[in-house]
């Protein structure tokens, strides 16, 4: 019986799972919407909701706890300066998971996880080297 065992293993070690959720949390904070598999989205939601609650608290200890979890100073800054004040009056339920069909190739169920009342302009913002190269060619 699996009573009392929370979460999924995803065929990864503990360290790999923690790193995966840290990276996914940072990506969700940065873009405010990401596409991933449905089980990963379901396990990511409580991680991100706890981070938003830390951002709402806003004290030094909460900031250090957030840094220990997501390890990205810029995303912690956004968490405490943008997302914390945005959800100050909301008592919970900061994330929404919407099913997004099935992935071509392995038919894995996909989902979109996003913040409720998200900033639509943050989507795709600074999406890595491909977008940086495109912006450099536009400037030239």
Swiss-Prot record:
- GO CC term (a single one): cytosolic large ribosomal subunit
Secretion signal span? none
Q: Which InterPro entries does UniProt cross-reference here?
A: Ribosomal_bL17 (IPR000456), Ribosomal_bL17_CS (IPR047859), Ribosomal_bL17_sf (IPR036373)
Q: Which domain of life is it from?
A: Bacteria
Its GO biological process annotations read: translation
Keywords, A to Z?
Answer: Ribonucleoprotein, Ribosomal protein
Quote any Pfam family the record assigns.
Ribosomal_L17
The chain's disulfide connectivity reads none
Q: What molecular functions are annotated in GO for this chain?
A: structural constituent of ribosome
Q: Which PANTHER family match?
A: LARGE RIBOSOMAL SUBUNIT PROTEIN BL17M, RIBOSOMAL PROTEIN L17
Q: How does it assemble?
A: Part of the 50S ribosomal subunit. Contacts protein L32.
What family is this?
A: Belongs to the bacterial ribosomal protein bL17 family.
Task: Tell me the protein's name.
Answer: Large ribosomal subunit protein bL17
Q: Organism source for this protein?
A: Methylobacterium nodulans (strain LMG 21967 / CNCM I-2342 / ORS 2060)
From the UniProt record, report the name of the gene that encodes this protein.
rplQ
């Amino acid at each position: 019986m699996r009573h009392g065992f929370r979460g999924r293993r995803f065929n990864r070690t503990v360290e790999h799972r923690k790193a995966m959720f840290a990276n996914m949390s940072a990506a969700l904070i940065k873009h405010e919407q990401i596409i991933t598999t449905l089980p990963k989205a379901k396990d990511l939601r409580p991680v991100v909701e706890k981070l938003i609650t830390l951002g709402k608290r806003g004290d030094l200890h909460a900031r250090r706890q957030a840094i220990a979890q997501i390890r990205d100073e810029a995303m912690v800054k956004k968490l405490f300066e943008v997302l914390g004040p945005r959800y100050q009056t909301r008592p919970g339920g900061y994330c929404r998971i919407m099913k997004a069909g099935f992935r071509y190739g392995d038919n894995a169920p996909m989902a979109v996880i996003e913040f409720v009342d998200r900033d639509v302009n943050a989507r795709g913002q600074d999406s890595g080297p491909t977008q940086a190269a495109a912006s450099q060619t536009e400037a030239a």
